[in-house]
Design a protein with these regions (language model features):
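Terminal substrate-recognition subdomain of acyl/acetyltransferases
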Residues: 2-60, 174-213
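A conserved beta-strand-loop-helix scaffold within acyl/acetyltransferase catalytic domains
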Residues: 20-145, 161
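Aromatic (often tryptophan-rich) hydrophobic motifs at membrane interfaces
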Residues: 105-210
Length: 213
């Protein structure tokens, strides 16, 4: 068509100049977080006191274990979580695409009760070995996991297995920033407990301009 949308990531301006605007409900991240993983030794030393206690509970219990899942099984149980239909559909499609494109770089972990195959919580991560980074893709928790340390157990498993694969950064991806949907707040608080360091970005500016002939 004759029109183009231009995107400008400004590092200094907080407000758009004349002719530019901030898109409502912009999908671009404005805050991300990551944790550094040591080459050897404990991965939990920088965790919050609460996360450390939950890790101890996970290690002390014997009823639950973490297994690696295939994409179909992960998506089957992910579809049972309390997220919106649109979010479930979007992340399910994303997981299936990544499984085809990245194969063994995609890791899908599930918490199950020993002796069963019913997944009560899950975590999807994608390794980027070229930069020694592992990226958080999605996670879920069903009602059966709410009174258990399953989510913290999954993060501990992610950190430890990443360390064994030579990963040095576990990237939690997006965090709540002012103006985002309030539904982000709870999971953002959870992800903030693991020695997380944050990167904040200015809002992106947009401009609609006629395409040059």
């Amino acid at each position: 068509g004759p029109w183009r949308i231009h995107k400008w990531d400004s590092y200094t301006l907080k407000h758009p100049p004349a002719g530019w605007f901030v898109a409502p409900g912009s999908p671009w991240r404005r805050r991300t977080g990551y944790a550094s993983i040591p080459a050897t030794g404990d991965v939990h030393l920088d965790w919050s006191d609460l996360a450390k206690r939950e890790r101890k509970k996970w290690l002390a219990q014997e009823q639950l274990e973490i297994i690696e899942l295939d994409p179909e099984t992960y998506c089957q149980f992910y579809a049972r979580c309390d997220k919106s239909t649109a979010i479930i559909a979007g992340f399910t499609a994303s997981i299936k695409r990544k499984a085809i494109a990245h194969k063994e770089r995609l890791h899908l972990y599930g918490v199950v009760r020993r002796g069963t195959t019913d997944v009560i919580a899950g975590l999807a991560i994608l390794d980027i070995p070229e930069i020694r980074t592992s990226l958080h893709i999605s996670g879920f928790m069903l009602d059966a996991a709410r009174q258990t340390p399953s989510n913290t157990g999954l993060i501990a498993h992610w950190f430890m297995t990443s360390q064994a694969r030579g990963i040095r950064v576990c990237d939690f991806d997006g965090f709540y920033a002012k103006g985002d949907a309030t539904s982000w707040k709870g999971f953002s608080r959870f992800k903030s407990q693991f020695g997380t360091r944050f990167i904040s970005y200015q809002k992106a500016f947009f401009c609609i301009a006629r395409k040059k002939q």
